[in-house]
């Protein structure tokens, strides 16, 4: 029911192109998750990128920063991301020690990873996110909200041809998110590409099970 999600995005999630940072954050997360499921989101990123560009330099919440990067990266505004990351560097210099640590060790690497993803530098995305994937908590947001970073990691592993890593990440994911249609679908695809027919068949049976439940 992806069209229904897009309709909700337009009518409730980001109906008036709000510039409130939490609205931008939520909108970017939805679009990123939809695109990870191969859903065409139209020109929605372009509109969100313009609003994100206007928020550059406010640094209200470190968790929101990567969401600005998502919007800017999707719209190919990489010079704006470079400016965003440089602004974060300057902000870190005047921040308390704890916030400085978050900026330098989480916010900036995640922003760079997302920028690299949209540049097609998928291996760099993997290299940046892999060491952080169990340590996102200090950046803020809920566990479910931070999970969007794992979408980038898994997709980058697949796109960079690191299928054994992708299989491992997806196996870990479906063990926890047993009703995640998209995760099972990707797991089936990766296992099939690796010649693991047993796990590919099982994953495909889970896709079929969830499809029946959805319809």
Model segments located where?
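Helix-coil-helix junctions within alpha-helical repeat/solenoid scaffolds
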Residues: 1-212
């Amino acid at each position: 029911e992806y069209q229904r999600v897009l309709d909700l995005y337009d009518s409730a999630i980001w109906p008036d192109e709000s510039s409130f940072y939490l609205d931008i954050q939520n909108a970017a997360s939805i679009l990123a998750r939809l695109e990870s499921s191969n859903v065409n989101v139209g020109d929605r990123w372009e509109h969100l990128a313009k609003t994100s560009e206007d928020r550059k330099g406010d640094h209200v919440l470190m968790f929101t920063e990567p969401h600005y990067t998502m919007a800017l990266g999707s719209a190919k505004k990489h010079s704006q991301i470079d400016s965003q990351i440089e602004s974060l560097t300057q902000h870190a210099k005047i921040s308390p020690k704890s916030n400085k640590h978050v900026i330098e060790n989480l916010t900036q690497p995640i922003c760079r990873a997302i920028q690299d993803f949209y540049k097609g530098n998928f291996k760099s995305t993997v290299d940046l996110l892999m060491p952080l994937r169990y340590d996102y908590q200090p950046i803020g947001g809920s566990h479910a909200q931070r999970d969007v970073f794992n979408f980038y990691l898994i997709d980058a592993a697949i796109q960079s041809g690191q299928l054994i890593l992708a299989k491992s990440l997806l196996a870990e994911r479906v063990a926890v998110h047993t009703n995640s249609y998209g995760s099972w679908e990707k797991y089936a695809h990766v296992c099939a590409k690796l010649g693991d027919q047993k796990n590919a068949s099982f994953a495909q049976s889970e896709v079929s099970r969830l499809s029946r439940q959805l319809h």
